[in-house]
């Protein structure tokens, strides 16, 4: 846990607070005058924010959500990555969804910064998180007439697992920058991405990896400067958006290390996600599904395309200039594909 805390501290220390203006796609203004109305809503007093009680085997805790907009036919719940990251990495959605009249919900999962953070490692379990999402869905009144579930990275794992158990509640499913197998992700990292690195840099990184010296400041510096800026968000560190900086600053390392492990080159150690794989179950998903991949991601975009073909009703969208956080480093392509999918599903257009 200490090494992950150091990693995020090093990242934040290197980052400046300057923000780069983001590209925007041209979208017609929303003509629905009721999009911002709070009429008939119970969250006006808090500006759309709602704390939702979540029942777990270890007690009841509260998770943070925030609604933006009104649309009875399109409601998108955003599942952040990490695990243990925050909704802050999705703040750029404010630049694209409102003018399309898309209602959407920010949500910090249990353990994340804006929600309760119980000190019990047994809670950081995929199956429990699935039940948490179901409780959030019920509390927000989402159903198969309007409920689109978006998940990126770990959020994509959670979205797949939710669909495998509760797809009857979904209108649409979006899996962004995630493959259906952690072992496949690790193989891609070891056999494809690692050999592309500068040999001297890779050799030095592997010295620390082999020694499990993940807290070494030199290791962290190498990871940030030679891996993050190539495969996590393809921008110079000084141009990383403030929302990303805050997301890293607020990440809960206890959740992250328990599920993901301490290494940035795959899921290692006794991390609970180490052997996660749902490839043989995807064919049971009937919900219209979008898989978003990126050319420079930490994971194989071809596997993301395979995912789209494996589900019964899928579409693949590639962000050719993007990496893991393609909503920032290939923003125009990312949102054009995402918005088009939501529109097509809403209008009944075949994928």
What is each residue range found by the language model?
Residues 203-283, 287:
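Alpha/beta-hydrolase
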Residues 84-95:
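The serine-hydrolase catalytic nucleophile loop
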Residues 145-188:
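Conserved hydrolase catalytic core segment
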Residues 279-321:
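Conserved loop-alpha-helix segment in the C-terminal half of the alpha/beta-hydrolase fold
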Residues 128-146:
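Conserved acidic catalytic loop of the alpha/beta-hydrolase fold
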Residues 314-351:
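Catalytic active-site module of serine/aspartate enzymes centered on a nucleophile-bearing elbow/loop
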Residues 97-116:
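Conserved alpha/beta-hydrolase
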Residues 173-214:
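Flexible "cap/lid" loop of the alpha/beta hydrolase fold
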């Amino acid at each position: 846990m200490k090494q992950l805390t150091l990693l995020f501290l090093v990242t934040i220390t290197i980052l400046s607070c300057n923000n780069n203006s983001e590209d925007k796609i041209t979208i017609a203004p929303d003509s629905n005058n009721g999009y911002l109305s709070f009429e008939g809503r119970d969250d006006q007093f808090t500006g759309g924010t709602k704390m939702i009680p979540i029942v777990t085997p270890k007690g009841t805790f509260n998770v943070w959500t925030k609604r933006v907009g009104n649309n009875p036919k399109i409601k998108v719940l955003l599942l952040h990555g990490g695990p243990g990251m925050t909704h802050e990495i999705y703040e750029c959605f404010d630049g694209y969804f409102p003018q399309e009249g898309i209602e959407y919900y920010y949500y910090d999962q249990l353990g994340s910064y804006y929600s309760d953070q119980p000190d019990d490692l047994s809670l950081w379990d995929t199956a429990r998180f699935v039940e948490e999402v179901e409780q959030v869905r019920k509390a927000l009144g989402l159903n198969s007439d309007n409920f689109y579930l978006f998940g990126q990275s770990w959020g994509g794992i959670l979205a797949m697992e939710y669909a495998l158990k509760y797809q009857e509640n979904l209108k649409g499913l979006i899996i962004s920058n995630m493959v259906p197998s952690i072992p496949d992700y690790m193989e891609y990292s070891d056999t494809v991405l690692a050999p592309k690195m500068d040999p001297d840099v890779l050799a030095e990184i592997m010295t620390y990896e082999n020694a499990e010296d993940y807290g070494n400041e030199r290791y962290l510096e190498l990871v940030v400067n030679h891996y993050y800026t190539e495969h996590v968000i393809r921008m110079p560190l000084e141009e990383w958006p403030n929302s990303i900086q805050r997301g890293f600053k607020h990440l809960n390392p206890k959740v992250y290390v328990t599920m993901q492990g301490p290494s940035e080159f795959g899921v290692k150690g006794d991390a609970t996600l180490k052997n996660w794989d749902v490839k043989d179950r995807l064919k049971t998903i009937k919900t219209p599904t979008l898989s978003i991949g990126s050319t420079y991601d930490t994971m194989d975009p071809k596997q993301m395309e395979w995912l789209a073909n494996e589900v019964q009703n899928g579409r693949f969208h590639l962000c050719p200039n993007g990496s893991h956080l393609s909503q920032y480093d290939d923003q125009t392509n990312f949102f054009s594909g995402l918005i088009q999918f939501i529109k097509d599903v809403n209008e009944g257009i075949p994928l």
